[in-house]
Regions:
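Winged-helix/helix-turn-helix nucleic-acid-interaction surface
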Residues: 60, 69-124
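Short recognition helix of helix-turn-helix/winged-helix DNA-binding domains
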Residues: 1-72, 94-95
Length: 124
């Protein structure tokens, strides 16, 4: 991704999702809990969707934004997809394939409504 700064809008989503993730984490082993990196990534994906902007960010870019590693980012993306919070598709742009992440409104609303009942749709 270039050094061009992409503008995105803040939304009230952040606190609601963070609260739901906190409730989900209660009593779970650390390995099953949502992390701050998970919250940061879904927040970025939602912000771009909220701004009607496609989210093509690379793992390297997301690692910089979340102060982690590309491998940790990929694990987080897989987890968010497995819980139905975001979607991934591949799109062609400028003659090359790029991953596009989108916010799954229905899945996220279901999660926020009853985080304790959330289960992964598939293993990461």
């Amino acid at each position: 991704m270039s050094n061009q700064k992409i503008q995105y809008k803040h939304s009230p989503f952040d606190e609601e999702m963070y609260d739901a993730m906190t409730i989900f984490n209660e009593g779970k082993p650390t390995s099953e809990q949502f992390s701050l990196i998970d919250a940061r990534i879904i927040s970025l994906v939602h912000s771009y969707d909220y701004s009607d902007t496609k989210f093509f960010a690379s793992n390297k870019y997301l690692a910089e934004k979340s102060r982690s590693t590309p491998a940790t980012v990929q694990k987080s993306i897989n987890k968010l997809i497995s819980y139905g919070l975001i979607n991934k598709k591949v799109a062609c742009s400028d003659g090359r394939k790029q991953r596009v992440l989108t916010y799954n409104e229905d899945g996220a609303e279901k999660f926020k409504t009853n985080p304790k009942a959330a289960k992964p749709m598939f293993e990461e």
